[in-house]
Amino acid sequence: MAKIADPRDIILAPVVSEKSYGLMEQNTYAFFVAPTANKTEIKIAIEQIFGVKVDSVNTANRAGKRKRSRTGYGVRKATKRAYVTLREGSDAIDIFGGNAA
């Protein structure tokens, strides 16, 4: 396997949303990831950080929203999300410290 950057530079944070809680029941977890990370790097980073086996990785790039303020317009930063599905029989990831939904 190729050596990658520090896994904590690739996986930034878990996504906290209703969708991510619902996906946890299907053994799929959502994370904010570095915009330059590819699926292979994300898979290796998840396996190193959490000690689980990854079945598949899907990614989604989200453009930043245009927001208006009193002085004009600004743009929220764009994000990249990774939806990681674990292999059957793999242990669950406890990223929120409690029971799912």
Swiss-Prot record:
Cross-referenced Pfam families: Ribosomal_L23
GO molecular function, one term: structural constituent of ribosome
Keyword Lyase part of the UniProt annotation: no
GO biological process: translation
Keyword field: Ribonucleoprotein, Ribosomal protein, RNA-binding, rRNA-binding
Organism domain of life: Bacteria
One GO CC annotation: ribonucleoprotein complex
Complex and partners: Part of the 50S ribosomal subunit. Contacts protein L29, and trigger factor when it is bound to the ribosome.
Protein's job: One of the early assembly proteins it binds 23S rRNA. One of the proteins that surrounds the polypeptide exit tunnel on the outside of the ribosome. Forms the main docking site for trigger factor binding to the ribosome.
UniProt similarity note: Belongs to the universal ribosomal protein uL23 family.
PANTHER family listed in its UniProt record: 60S RIBOSOMAL PROTEIN L23A (PTHR11620)
Protein name: Large ribosomal subunit protein uL23
Species this chain originates from: Corynebacterium diphtheriae (strain ATCC 700971 / NCTC 13129 / Biotype gravis)
